[in-house]
């Protein structure tokens, strides 16, 4: 039976604040801070536990091998000898944000009846551009069943940032849906990371029906305001689109196109007069997981920052007492990820699949999360300062930490 499974990226032992992500305001504002990898990973595990308790199927991906010595070798250097900016890019733990791992089209949408996944190339940012080989290996292992078709990345220079710029509307996760690809147009101070050509290539690969596939331009105002991915200003679930007024370049045309393709859509729009774009981005209101609850209705799994931003929380409280589709609010603490620019939705990749077709090593239950938390508590560094990235001792420690996790999960082939 098809159901939506959220696969969260386990936050890796090299989690640090190097400020590598241009256009990501949180990342830039925390550059040079001391990170807490152990606390970060435990926060992510607690979010997974929270969603399991809600009755939501939960999976995970393991951290990639970092620092990426082969990538540095291809640049003619090494972890020990690299210039500071290259070393930081090699150490990045950014694969934690699984929403950028791939774009996923469920089987009901594809002409061949398979669930298609295209690994994201992430070419816009150097620190993420070398993620895809490790991510692809993991996707091919987790989704090796014939029910899936896992594709290599779209070729450069066509930038693709995965599911963070992709939404789906449907009457139920197991029903045919309308897929919405959101792209940006270059030209401002901050880069537009999702290219239209990349989105169109993915739609063709995934064998989607053109009549049920939309390409909508992200607002340049949103991009230049710090919404480096669409999931910072909009999120969809089943028949609901939850969006900020400034999310799309031509709001009226976008809404009309969406309604024409999926007439049952409920658009829950937050006006800029109630919640400014700046407050939406600072609180990551829209980088929430909009989920269908087993008992019925929908809920938002939000960062605690949304609760702490009065304009945002006041609007949300007024919304849930109304007669709308979103009825419950669940704040979660992912502050360590938030400080690098990734909220609850960034940390997960949504895959509609029969759990029986997924490699069970990637599916979570309470006992497995206990096992992961035990490895993290024992092996993850408590803190990493920028200067620590030059430490040979830390390098060996984080490698041992990751291998301990792989061993605990019987995933040593990813070593």
UniProtKB/Swiss-Prot annotation:
Q: State which Enzyme Commission number(s) the record gives.
A: 3.5.3.23
Which pathway does UniProt place it in?
Amino-acid degradation; L-arginine degradation via AST pathway; L-glutamate and succinate from L-arginine: step 2/5
Instruction: Tell me which residues this entry annotates as catalytic.
Output: 161, 229, 346 (nucleophile)
The reaction(s) this protein catalyses = N(2)-succinyl-L-arginine + 2 H2O + 2 H(+) = N(2)-succinyl-L-ornithine + 2 NH4(+) + CO2
Which keywords does this chain's UniProt record carry? Arginine metabolism, Hydrolase
> What are the binding positions for substrate in this chain?
18-27, 100, 127-128, 193, 231, 340
Q: Which Gene3D superfamilies match?
A: Succinylarginine dihydrolase (3.75.10.20)
SUPFAM superfamilies cross-referenced by the UniProt entry:
Pentein
Instruction: Name any one GO molecular function.
Output: N-succinylarginine dihydrolase activity
Kindly name one Pfam family recorded for this protein: AstB
Q: Which domain of life is it from?
A: Bacteria
Instruction: Give a GO biological-process term.
Output: arginine catabolic process to glutamate
| InterPro entries, per the entry | AstB_sf, SuccinylArg_d-Hdrlase_AstB
Q: What does this protein do?
A: Catalyzes the hydrolysis of N(2)-succinylarginine into N(2)-succinylornithine, ammonia and CO(2).
Quaternary state and interactors: Homodimer.
Q: Provide the family line.
A: Belongs to the succinylarginine dihydrolase family.
Q: Which PANTHER family match?
A: N-SUCCINYLARGININE DIHYDROLASE
Q: What is this protein called?
A: N-succinylarginine dihydrolase
